[in-house]
């Protein structure tokens, strides 16, 4: 129906006849000549409807309004002197219309398509209108390129694309499952997969050797800016591999994805042990676009005559005292800002925020009186302090201190404008603990219980490490993976350490244990969150900007009004009766 997309046209097409299709983005009547900005998925081009060129087209144009669907035929000409629009990629040209057709009309839209001030709820209610915005379209054009690049890259490395089931069995993977009642087997439920984890391991047991899938996953969890109840991941598994092999494959397809999106990245990515990431940055996904690395000063504080700090410093296993040096911070931060910093860390469990300022005549601040001159000199040397600097200290329980100082590090970086929004800093975080302790004292798998432990015979669960790895970009976890357990006895031992008894093992994971008993190969893999990846590539503020029809933070679709009540007939067929007064 059309001869070109708008964006395909430029000054080299002057004199050509074209046929264009799209929507009225804006409409202006200038003394009898009507100008229409015609929008298609690629962008905007200006139509000129002059009665001297075509009375019929001019008359039809006079009836057009915003969001009407038009088909326009005409000739490309250059814009007049001083009329070039540098904001448009087609700003050097316009189309003199000889024939115009209104294919469909539109009622008055609830908002202007390009209006960025419209609240998100209204945009999501009318998502089909919101998606007409060329800026959003560009997000999905990049997403499409990324998916094609991932498929091509993995296929070139010998991976086979295989689809795994959506209706499956509930397995504990860290979040709540979405359950689907069975009509045929009343009282029983399918679960929507949180990941294809077990199925891809079974494919390795089947001898498929190299698998991938761009997979839909579902998790019933509380939502944040970077979470959705349904999301997409680039899922990869391979046999007869070590950690370095999986990392090499992941770096290869990530490099190809970024190249397809117009960005060059350098490989290999740097690597950092989990322990070092936590101790130096207070996060297992540190943002390395800026420094502000922690400095360990617990040994110096152990010599202070402040009872609180001295007691904290006695137990170096359970407690931490960390410093963050801000060069020239004393010349930058006002007294009010220093108060704001303390208010910030208190929100995350800090008792306060101690600091020392570096003046021309030495170190100053309430802390200084608790240290000898020798200890202050050692502190100054350890922190590499210079005149004008300020150094902040966090002290207390290990988990609390690392958490709030990690958050404070990012807060400071934003305050100081240290983050380059165009930088791409990749990092592998490796050697994660196998288990983590919950608030109730019990233990759970830090990644998942199918991860291969390094030292399974260690008596202290907190000392058992795993062959697990996460890939981080600019402080955001893009994805993670591990070498898997491929031996039945090791898998059963991990289950027992997690207090999953033999009966539960058979009920929940019997099929996996069976598969591991029939000569399962060594295998491992990784999953990359596609939505997060595209969010970072496009610079979108929210993951909802890169998902065509996203849910709200209350897991609702405002457009379709899902979820919604089921009919009484459907409930009867499923054998389900709801309790009254459900809230």
From Swiss-Prot:
Keywords for this protein: Aminoacyl-tRNA synthetase, ATP-binding, Cytoplasm, Ligase, Nucleotide-binding, Protein biosynthesis
Cellular component, GO annotation: cytoplasm
Binding site for ATP: 219-221, 228, 477, 529-532
Binding of L-aspartate, residues: 173, 219, 447, 484
GO MF terms, alphabetically ordered: aspartate-tRNA ligase activity; aspartate-tRNA(Asn) ligase activity; ATP binding; nucleic acid binding
Subcellular location: Cytoplasm
Span list, region Aspartate: 197-200
GO biological process: aspartyl-tRNA aminoacylation
EC number: 6.1.1.23
Site positions per UniProt: Important for tRNA non-discrimination: 30, 82
Pfam families from the UniProt entry: GAD (PF02938), tRNA-synt_2 (PF00152), tRNA_anti-codon (PF01336)
PANTHER family the record matches: ASPARTATE--TRNA LIGASE, MITOCHONDRIAL (PTHR22594:SF5), ASPARTYL/LYSYL-TRNA SYNTHETASE (PTHR22594)
Oligomer status and interactors: Homodimer.
Purpose of the protein: Aspartyl-tRNA synthetase with relaxed tRNA specificity since it is able to aspartylate not only its cognate tRNA(Asp) but also tRNA(Asn). Reaction proceeds in two steps: L-aspartate is first activated by ATP to form Asp-AMP and then transferred to the acceptor end of tRNA(Asp/Asn).
The family this protein is said to belong to: Belongs to the class-II aminoacyl-tRNA synthetase family. Type 1 subfamily.
Protein name: Aspartate--tRNA(Asp/Asn) ligase
Organism, scientific name: Campylobacter jejuni subsp. doylei (strain ATCC BAA-1458 / RM4099 / 269.97)
